[in-house]
Amino acid sequence: MANNMIACRKSFTDTLLELARQDKDIVAVTTDARGSVTLGDFAKELPAQFVECGIAEQDAVGISAGLAHSGKKVFVCGPACFYVARSLEQVKVDLAYSQNNVKILGVSGGVAYGALGATHHSLHDIAVLRTFPGMNIVLPCDARQTRKLVKLLVDYPEPVYVRVGRAAVPDVYENDDFEFVLGKANTLLDGTDLTIIAAGETVYHAYQAGLMLREKGIQARVLDMSSIKPVDVEAIRKAAEETGRIITVEEHSRFGGLGAIVVETLSENPVPVRIIGIPDENVVHGNSHEIFAHYGLDKEGICKTALEFVKK
C-alpha cells in the first residue's frame, strides 16, 4: 500500500478541472465554499464554467438541475452536512425524481469537521439518500479511486452523491491498475475466517486491520464497498456464505447505512453481523482521528472487534 497523502476533495476537483478544459459542458457550482471544496483553481481558469451561488444550497441544487436539463454536466460542490439537510427537498425532487444529470460532491463528510460538532457532521446522508429512487451513492476511499470516479461520472447519465472527507488520506491502491465500477466491490484481502466491509475513508483502516489480524493467525477478507448504491449484492452474499461472519465499518450512523444494507441483503439467509459506526448520540468532540478511535473506527478498534467476534 502506497504512502501518498492526498485529500480526496483535491483529487476530485483537480480531475474535474482537467476534464473541464476539454469539455465546455462541464460546469461546477458551489455555495461560498470554493476554498473548502478546493475549486479555487477551477474558478480562476474557467470562470465561464463556474457558478457561485453564495450560502444558498437550495438554490444551488435547483440551478444545477436547470443547467443539467439544458444539457450541461453539472457538479454541485459544498459541505456534505448542508446538501443532505438544507437542500434535501431539491435533491429529492429536482435531481432524483426528475433524473437530472447532477453530481453532488459533499466534502468534509462524516465526522471530518471534528470539533465543529454535531451541526457540521453528516452521519445521516447514506440513510436518507438511498431511499430516493434513481439516486446513486459513492464514498471513494483514496485519491486514486476518486480520480477514476470523476472520469466515470462525467458521462454517467444519473444523479450521484459523492461523499469525501477533508484531510489528506493514505492511498489504499498502490497504482492505477484496478477497476472502479459502480455496483461492484473490490477485494483488498481474501480470507475465510470473517469479512470486513468498509466504505470511504474507513477502507484504509479496514485493510490495515486485516493485515494486523493476519499476524494473529486470522484470515480476514476485506472488501472496499465504496459504491453504496448500487451495492454489490453478490459480493455480500458470497462473503456471508464463504466466511460466515461480517463486520461493517462506516463513518455514519449505525442506523440506515452500510451495516443496514448488509443486514437487509442477508435477511433471508442471515449470518452474524457486527456494525461499527456512530451510535445514537451526538458525536464526542475532537478531531477526526480522536473520534475514529473513540468509536472503534480505526484499525485498532476494528481489529479488537474482529478478535472478539471470532472467539464467540
Curated annotation (Swiss-Prot):
Pfam families: Transket_pyr, Transketolase_C. CDD domains: TPP_PYR_DXS_TK_like (cd07033). It is an enzyme of class 2 (transferase). Its EC number is 2.2.1.13. Keywords: Carbohydrate metabolism, Thiamine pyrophosphate, Transferase. It comes from the Bacteria. It catalyses: apulose 4-phosphate + D-glyceraldehyde 3-phosphate = D-xylulose 5-phosphate + dihydroxyacetone phosphate. Pathway: Carbohydrate metabolism. The keyword Secreted does not apply. Its cofactor is thiamine diphosphate. The keyword Ion transport does not apply. Coiled coil: none annotated. One of its GO terms (molecular function) is transferase activity. InterPro entries: PDH/Transketolase, THDP-binding, Transketo_C/PFOR_II, Transketolase-like_Pyr-bd, Transketolase_C. Involved in catabolism of D-apiose. Catalyzes the transfer of the glycolaldehyde group from apulose-4-phosphate to D-glyceraldehyde 3-phosphate, generating dihydroxyacetone phosphate and D-xylulose-5-phosphate. Probable heterodimer composed of AptA and AptB. Belongs to the transketolase family. This is Apulose-4-phosphate transketolase subunit B. The lineage of its organism: Bacteria, Pseudomonadati, Bacteroidota, Bacteroidia, Bacteroidales. The gene is aptB.
